[in-house]
Every structure is written in structure tokens, then in C-alpha cells.
Amino acid sequence: MEAHKPVLFDEVMEGLAIRPDGIYVDGTFGRGGHSFGILQRLGPNGRLMAMDKDPDAVAVANKALFEDARFSIVHETFANLQKAVRDRGWEGKVNGILLDIGVSSPQLEDAKRGFSFSKDGPLDMRMNPKQSMDAASWINQAAMEDIRRVLWNYGEERFAKRIAQAIVNAREEKPITRTQELSDIVIKAYPQREIKKHPATRTFQAIRIFINRELDELRECLPQCLETLAVGGRLCVISFHSLEDRLVKRFIQKESRDHLPREIPILAKDIKHRLKPLGSLIRPTEAEIKKNPRARSARLRIVEKLS
């Protein structure tokens, strides 16, 4: 299988500390770059299970790796990771898990998927097209306050109220069904003095995260990773914006710090921490950013399970 070299590839491979006979999970197959790297480092007795809720990604995996007995792909969100691991009898035996959060480059580049404000296409944004609600159906029926809340909570968009009002005004004229239409609405609503990057960036991010339950699924997945890992197993999480990274950071802090009240008479050495952070936050090198500008906002956190 030929695969593109994904973001922070070398750092992830080092962070997973891959054992030739180990069991690994790639929770976000995408186009297989990380999975391919793991398989290259596994021996004949090693195993890799990949997951992806995008049927296009599953089709790529089945075509490229169907002959590799060490590999299996599950068409499922990583929010159901523990069940998929349990079905294989691997619970508590997994040596490494990778989560590469967010939208993939192929999804962004395919105008028909509706993720990009720079390519006109149907306003869809579903990672799993079998999911019932797409971006257009939501944006044309949601209350203005609900739109404002989504733009603020998931995009940290300062002008959420203005944009939400502009969306409601525009859809009264005709339904919003194309990515270009939504992008134009946001551009017109944005104060010109504030334009430093494309005005629709945060709006598209927020709607995509909401439609696909991205933060909810990450929140559900992280405790499952802890339960499925073997002691000494590694978890690597790549995030691309502060909302995701904040969620991951708080989970790691909760499972790795002393968080009992000071008045409780227990010594720190007697508290069993479940996770140990390995190093600090990892960012891509300037050389990687030059080759792949999308890598600029990537952040990698690596932890090891202690108990």
C-alpha cells in the first residue's frame, strides 16, 4: 500500500513505541498513512484494528490492505472503540491507540462532501453520509439562538450573533444548500476590519463539529482508551484546534494528577495515578509545515497507562 505521510508521522511512530508482536488501534484510519506506518513496524504476530465512520475511508482500507491478515477495519466511530476491542477479546491488552481528530485532507478536498468553504459543493459536512442530518438541513431549520450557540461553542466565533442573524435572513429568501452560499453570507456579515483569515473558517469548523458530534465522541472515547489499554500501553492524540486539545489535556490531567482534597490524609505516593504524560505538547517542525501547511495547527499529546 502506498500512503501519503500524515501529520506528525515520525513523532507518532516513536510515541507508540511499537512492539513487533503488539496489538494496536488506529481510531481514525483516514487514508491509512499512520496505519501503514504501524504495519511496517509489526511482525507477523502483531495486530492492527483501524476504525473510521467514513465509508470512503473504509473502502480504501479494504482495497489496499485486504490481504494483510494482521489488519482489520471497522466501519464505526471511535466513540464505540471499547466494544470493537472487546469483540476481538483485546480489552486490557492493547499496546497502543492513535486518535487523529477532525476532518481529513481527502474529505476537505472533495467538493461533493461539503466540508470546504473554498470549493463549491452541496452543504453536507457529514463524515458518515448515512447519518440523517446534514449541514444544510440543520442550518435551514435551526433557531437563530441555536446557530449562534453552535458558532460560539464549537468555533469560538466572536461574531456568532451577527452571522447567525445573517443566515436566518438569507434563508428567508431561499434555502441555503451550497457551501459557496454559506461562505458568501458569512463574508458579508463579517466586519471588514476584522478579516485576517477567511471569515468562514470558524463557521464551517463549528457546524462540522456539531453535525458530526466530534467533541462528544472524543469525550466518550478517551475513557474507553484508558480501559482498553494494557498497563504500559500508549495513547497518542493529534488535535488541530484548541477545543479538542483542551478536552484531551483536561482528561490527561484528571487521570494523572493528585486531585483529592488536601484535607484528606493520604500521601501522594499512595495515590494510584492511571496515566503518565510522556513529554510535553508536541508540535510539527518548520520543515514539516513547509511541506504540509495543514500541519501548522497540529498538536500531539502522548500518555502511558500506569494502572
Swiss-Prot record:
Pfam family of the protein (one): Methyltransf_5
Catalytic activity field: cytidine(1402) in 16S rRNA + S-adenosyl-L-methionine = N(4)-methylcytidine(1402) in 16S rRNA + S-adenosyl-L-homocysteine + H(+)
GO MF terms, alphabetically ordered: rRNA (cytosine-N4-)-methyltransferase activity
Predominant place of localization: cytoplasm
SUPFAM superfamilies per record: Putative methyltransferase TM0872, insert domain, S-adenosyl-L-methionine-dependent methyltransferases
InterPro entries: RsmH, SAM-dep_MeTrfase_MraW_recog, SAM-dependent_MTases_sf
Alphabetical list of Gene3D superfamilies matching this protein: Putative methyltransferase TM0872, insert domain, Vaccinia Virus protein VP39
Annotated S-adenosyl-L-methionine binding sites: 32-34, 52, 78, 100, 107
EC number: 2.1.1.199
Keyword Cell wall biogenesis/degradation found: no
Domain of life: Bacteria
Keywords: Cytoplasm, Methyltransferase, rRNA processing, S-adenosyl-L-methionine, Transferase
One BP term from GO: rRNA base methylation
Localisation: Cytoplasm
GO-annotated cellular components: cytoplasm
HAMAP family the UniProt entry points to: 16SrRNA_methyltr_H (MF_01007)
The protein's role, per its UniProt record: Specifically methylates the N4 position of cytidine in position 1402 (C1402) of 16S rRNA.
Family membership: Belongs to the methyltransferase superfamily. RsmH family.
Stored NCBIfam families: 16S rRNA (cytosine(1402)-N(4))-methyltransferase RsmH
Protein name: Ribosomal RNA small subunit methyltransferase H
Organism: Coxiella burnetii (strain RSA 493 / Nine Mile phase I)
Gene this protein is translated from: rsmH
